[in-house]
Swiss-Prot record:
GO terms for molecular function: manganese ion binding; RNA binding; RNA-DNA hybrid ribonuclease activity. Its cofactor is Mn(2+); Mg(2+). The keyword Metal-binding applies. One of its GO terms (cellular component) is cytoplasm. It is found in: Cytoplasm. Residues 11-197 form the RNase H type-2 domain. SUPFAM superfamilies: Ribonuclease H-like. NCBIfam families: PRK00015.1-1 (NF000594), PRK00015.1-3 (NF000595), PRK00015.1-4 (NF000596). Pfam families: RNase_HII. Its EC number is 3.1.26.4. This is Ribonuclease HII. The keyword Iron does not apply.
């Protein structure tokens, strides 16, 4: 799955991906995963192309079989202070730094890499091309969706379990009706507009 992207001296490759750049609420969540070549995981794919049930099953398998995995995050307040791009890079750094095994090489989904003390490469559409990035994509998505379920219990009127914080018609309507929660990203235009900022 990653034949074109192997760093010639790398044995331990970490894949990194993020979920939650677009939502109006909550953290951006990242994951870093070092897979075990002796325990391949079938069915890895971009998390957006998998059903919720399949993602949850795969997340459990990834956590059991991976050599190492970790999550990172940047909260809504950090997103507002830094902007979403810099907050995403910070969350990726946190995920990589939280790994209990240091990778030889890091493959990051997208076209930018965070500042790291190890070699790294950005892979456009990496969540569909690189097993480690697919695994990271799944862990980050399952973790963030779970957080949205919890937020939905705290603020049931917003429908977070349904739209996961993305700027859907329903979310914008509820935002206009009820105002922003403390977890909304105040720097994002629809929230700023509601708050009159």
């Amino acid at each position: 799955m990653r034949t074109n992207f192997i760093y010639h001296n790398a044995n331990l490759i970490a894949g990194v991906d993020e979920v939650g750049r677009g939502p109006l609420v909550g953290a951006v969540v990242t994951a870093a995963v070092i897979l075990d070549p002796q325990q391949p995981i079938l069915g890895l794919a971009d998390s957006k192309k998998l059903s919720e049930k399949k993602r949850i099953l795969l997340a459990t398998e990834i956590k059991q079989k991976a050599l190492c995995w970790s999550l990172g995050r940047a909260e809504a307040e950090e997103i507002d202070q830094l902007n979403i791009l810099h907050a995403t890079m910070l969350a990726m750094q946190r995920a990589i730094n939280a790994l209990t095994i240091q990778p030889d090489f890091v493959l990051v989904d997208g076209n930018r890499i965070p500042s790291l003390n190890m070699p790294a490469q950005a892979i456009v559409k990496g969540d569909s091309l690189v097993a480690e990035i697919s695994a990271a994509s799944i862990l980050a998505k399952v973790a963030r969706d779970h957080e949205m379920q919890i937020l939905d219990q705290q603020f049931p009127e917003y429908g977070f379990a349904q739209h996961k914080g993305y700027p859907t018609k329903l979310h914008i309507e509820k935002l206009a009706q009820f105002g922003a929660t403390p977890f909304h990203r105040k720097s994002f235009a629809p929230v700023r507009k509601i708050l009159g900022l």
